[in-house]
Structure formats: structure tokens, C-alpha cells
Amino acid sequence: NGLDGKWVFTLHNPSVMPFLQYADKRDLREKIFKAYTNRGNNNNENDNKEVVKQLVTARLEKARLMGYEDYAAFVLEENMAKNEKNVYDLLDKIWPSALAKAKEELADINAEIKKEGGNYEAEGWDWRYYFEKAKKAKYNLDENEMRPYFELGHVREGIFYVANKLYGITFTEIKDIPKPDPDALAFECKDKDGTHLGVLYMDFFTRPGKGGGAWCGGYRSQTYKDGKRVAPVVTTVFNFSKPAEGQPALLTADETETVFHEFGHALHSLFCDVHYYGVSDVPRDFVELPSQVDEHWAVEPEVLKVYAKHYQTGEVIPQALVDKMIKSGKYGQGFATTEYLAASYLDMDYHVLKEIPADLDIEKF
């Protein structure tokens, strides 16, 4: 395509985020940021604004058919939150503190811009770039310092080690099994008594046509048939950048935490023991608990000694680097939390509507 010697950046998350974090050219950061944030919002055949309108309309109709005045009331009744007021009360309680912290972080970022002679206030495409600089200035920590200690194969050993220590379960790779991609791996999970618990797939790298982000799903849910347990087939899916041939896959600290997080979901599914899966779900707002718990094992000293080893020398990650990583880990929570809260408010505001206006403007809502 005449692009020999050039770098190609796609609008996949693992390509966009490092670019926004490290690219020095502000105009290019702006270009990729706007392209990324406006996916599905370009007034063309792939525009999703009308789809959003159709979704909220169909959901309200479904709720009415079930006897509820809006979709949020219908969904929340079966969740721990129970009602709309409890959700808004929680969001309203967190918002002021998160916003105050985000403003502090913004001040740090604008200070970094001025330090470099910039005569402008931070925009969306500046945030990650200058946030990385502010973080490095505060904690003397470069994310790339940690990557050599988080080689993907070692991280996988770490999650299996935790599961074995806590629950006595083991994971053995299965070679002769269909897989969604040649780079995906499959493992048989056995309980401490040697009985078959299930199969775990791990699909690590981004590729064309693959959904973005990371999640845990399944090809088969656990159930019972004719009195016998049908074991689950669970999948954890990630979108890490695939390394060049012959090179190791080195993860960031955040990506490492993501592996532990999704593995927590996988354990939840593998340990499942219900007769009627479709009516045996936990409340939706409980679902993240097992994964949130599991991700904390990523920085436990005993666990780090097992998996956080330099991919070339085998040296265990220095404690001083771990301490800086933990301290810096909370930096940026203001921005991250306000982003989550804003999405939560938007979600609730759509789904408490009692009527959907014919002229609903998705961009202004």
C-alpha cells in the first residue's frame, strides 16, 4: 500500500491509548482522539444515534409491557440497588469528591503544559499525554520501567498460582481443541480432588473484527442434565497489542490488573454449581465483586515473587518499583471516577424516561 517504513495506528483501544499517552505531536493526538470518540457519530451509514433512540424506545416499551413505568424500575427491582433513588443517591454522594480530585489532576496537567511553554488549557487529547508526565514528575515512575516484569506468560502463571493456593484447583493446557484464534489458549481446570471443573479459554490479542476491551464470557454455561453436572466452558477475552514475531508480550501494570480481574470472573463461572442457569444469576450489580477481589492479588508480595520477573534476567521486580507503582496507582482516580459517573448518570437518565420525545436529540441529551 505504499506504506513501507510507516507506522499505522488503528482506532482499536490498544492502539489509540498508547498513542494518546506518548505521541508528542499534538495535532495527531487531536486527530486520533476525535476519530476515536466519534465512532458511530459521523452522520453516515454507520451512525448510531438513531440506534440509541430505537434502543431506549424498545426498552421503555418492554418495561411497560411488564407493568413498570420505566426501564430503570424494571431492571433495578432484581438488583441490589432495588430502585432509582438509591442509584442516584450513590452517584450524587460520590460525584463532588471525584470532581474535586479531577480538578486537582487537571491543575497538575495544565502546570505540565505551561512548564513546556504551552499557551493553552488541556483538551481531551492532551489529558493522557500530560497526565503521564505529571505522574512521572510526582512519583518518578515510567510505565515502561515495569513492562519487562509483566511478561504475559508469567502473568498467566501468577493467576494460576493464586487459584491453586486459595482453592487447590489446577490448570493444564489443552492442545487438541478448537480455538477462536491460533494465538488463543485453552486449559482444563480441575478441582483439588482431581474432578473436572471446566474449560478456560484465554484470547489475548486484538485482531480485525474482534470486539474492543476485555471481558469474560462462555461457550457453555454450567447446568445439570440427567442428574449429572455439565461443566462450563468459559472464555476470557483481552485486546493486548500482539508483539512482533519472536518478541515477548510485555504488559502494563493496568493490563496485568485486567488479567487478574477477568480471571476473577472466570473463577466465578468455573465454580458455578446450579441446576437452572438461566434463573440462577446473581444480581447484576454484584457481578463485579469476584473480579474486584481477584485483581488485588496482582500486587501481593508473595504473588509478585511468582510472576513479576524480568523477562530477560529472571530478576523479581524490585520492591521500590512496586511501592512506586502502588502509590501512583491511585493517581488519576478523579478523572477515571468522573468518567464512570458521567456514563452512569447518562445511562440512568435515558432509562428513567417515561416517554421518549419524537425529537430526542442524542448529542444534546
Segments predicted by a language model, with ranges:
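Hydrophobic alpha-helix feature that most strongly marks membrane-spanning transmembrane helices
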Residues: 37, 241-244, 264, 268-275, ...
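The catalytic-center signature of Zn2+-dependent metalloproteases
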Residues: 272-294, 299
